[in-house]
């Protein structure tokens, strides 16, 4: 076949001289049937504004796509539909039957092309999901979780609102509640985090405690409250501290035992041993200060386990991501999550960030995510990620705040999503916990 130019219609407007205001008014006055539905009117036509996307050539090995570097001659025949396999190639979607294809929904429009993303390409380069409350973010996250489960990929979900609990159990996964059946070892916390939990103010006490933490961290082994107390006493004695000073420091360290989420820690190798395991961390009961510490510790443990090969490739999803990667003050989680985002691709560890206020997210992190799902969102929030909308036409971007629930704009770089497209998220087989309840019966 000859080369064909694939174009995207941005806007369309009908030109119908038979239905101008004056003639339409006269027809109404005399009861003459209008011609708005006529399809065989000689002077009636539609003007469409288009954008060339790709030049496609069919070969024995499929379609070869090239940048649109030719001028389409006037009078060239235009087809209003293209074959499904060509549409997938243009958008960068794999065949839905491929083993690594994540089936998420269908493109909005007459073609209804299935939206399938290549898990091996998309997940290691990280994903961003944004949208206002009730627009479909949690529905999509649940859909992705189902697809990962079906394909045998492990997933850890940091669930701020407890929305994935029931769905996790339906998929045979495990729900953990920090402070109840999930604790984090003291050694998984960073030095400033540990010092911030021990109520010491005297300079000598702070120096002794800091040195003790540094020594234990240098040992690169797991340690707990008892280990910290023993090391602090040893350091204090080497400083020539009096017994009452050592007693005060010991008493302060003992108070760490009252923090409910400090403990032995979870065996992540065992928790993620089965193919397709979903682990949901229900963080509803954690106050903001503890939430930061728990998520930071979990991320460090899982990252180190994956880096050393102790656990298989996996995906971690984080709801309300702006709490952990803020645009202004650095949270406890920012350092470790930033490291994961930079290094995740090299160790097969993907990250999915979900937020209803992307303007509060660290801008550098937003840019690093290679695949983005944009649901209906306020214009002020949309402007904060305007530079991350790839080649989405201005007309589509303008309509994002008015998108219906469950419909989103999908964008990415050329490796993940070749061209921006609007699609409707498909159905789910598990419970949706993010549904807005009815206030009046």
PLM region descriptions:
Residues 99-180, 363, 410, 441:
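Glycine-rich phosphate-binding loop of nucleotide-binding enzymes
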Residues 39-40, 197-200, 341-421:
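Conserved ATP-driven motor cores of ASCE-family P-loop NTPases powering translocation/secretion/packaging/pilus
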Residues 158, 318, 354-355:
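Hydrophobic residues in beta-strands of the RecA-like P-loop NTPase core, especially within AAA+ ATPase
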Residues 13-15, 54-57, 161-165, 181, ...:
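Conserved nucleotide-binding/hydrolysis micro-motifs of P-loop NTPases
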Residues 8, 143-144, 163, 193, ...:
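Alpha-helical scaffold elements adjacent to nucleotide-binding pockets in ATP/GTP-utilizing enzyme cores
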Residues 161-162, 166-169, 173-176, 186-341, ...:
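P-loop NTPase motor domains
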Residues 271-272, 405-441:
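Conserved P-loop NTPase motor module
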Residues 1-130, 144, 309-312:
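Basic- and hydrophobic-enriched, low-structure N-terminal and domain-boundary segments
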């Amino acid at each position: 076949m000859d080369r064909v130019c694939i174009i995207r219609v941005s806007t369309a407007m009908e030109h119908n001289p038979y239905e101008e205001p004056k003639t339409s008014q006269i027809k109404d006055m005399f009861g003459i049937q209008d011609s708005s539905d006529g399809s065989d009117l000689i002077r009636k036509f539609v003007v469409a504004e288009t954008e060339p996307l790709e030049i496609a050539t069919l070969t024995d090995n499929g379609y070869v796509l090239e940048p649109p570097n030719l001028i389409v001659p006037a009078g060239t025949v235009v087809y209003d539909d293209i074959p499904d396999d060509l549409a997938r190639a243009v958008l960068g979607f794999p065949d839905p039957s491929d083993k690594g294809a994540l089936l998420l929904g269908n493109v909005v429009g007459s073609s209804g092309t299935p939206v399938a993303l290549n898990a091996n390409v998309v997940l290691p380069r990280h994903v961003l999901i944004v949208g206002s409350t009730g627009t479909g973010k949690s529905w999509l996250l649940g859909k992705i979780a189902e697809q990962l489960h079906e394909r045998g990929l492990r997933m850890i979900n940091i669930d701020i609102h407890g929305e994935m609990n029931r769905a996790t159990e339906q998929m045979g996964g495990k729900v953990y509640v920090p402070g109840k059946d999930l604790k984090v070892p003291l050694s998984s916390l960073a030095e400033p985090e540990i010092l911030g939990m021990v109520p010491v103010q005297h300079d000598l006490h702070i120096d002794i405690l800091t040195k003790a933490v540094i020594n234990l961290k240098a040992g690169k082994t797991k340690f707990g409250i008892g280990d910290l107390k023993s090391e602090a006493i040893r350091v204090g004695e080497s400083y020539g501290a009096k017994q009452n000073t050592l007693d005060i420091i010991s008493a302060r360290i003992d108070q760490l035992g009252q923090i409910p989420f400090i403990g032995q820690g979870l065996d992540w190798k065992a928790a993620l041993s089965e193919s397709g395991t979903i682990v949901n961390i229900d963080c509803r009961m954690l106050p903001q200060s503890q939430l930061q510490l728990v998520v930071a510790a979990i991320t460090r443990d899982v990252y180190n386990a994956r880096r050393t090969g102790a656990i298989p490739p996996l995906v971690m999803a984080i709801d309300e991501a702006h709490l952990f990667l803020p645009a202004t003050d650095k949270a406890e989680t920012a350092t470790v999550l930033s490291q994961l985002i930079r290094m995740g691709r090299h160790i097969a560890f993907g990250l999915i960030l979900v937020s209803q206020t992307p303007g509060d997210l660290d801008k550098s992190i937003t840019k690093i995510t290679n695949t983005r799902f944009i649901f209906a969102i306020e214009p002020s929030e949309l402007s904060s990620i305007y530079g991350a909308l790839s080649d989405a036409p201005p007309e589509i971007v303008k309509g994002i705040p008015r998108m219906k629930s469950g419909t989103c704009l999908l964008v990415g770089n050329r490796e993940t999503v070749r061209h921006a497209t609007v699609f409707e998220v498909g159905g789910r087989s598990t419970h949706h916990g993010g549904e807005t309840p009815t206030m009046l019966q």
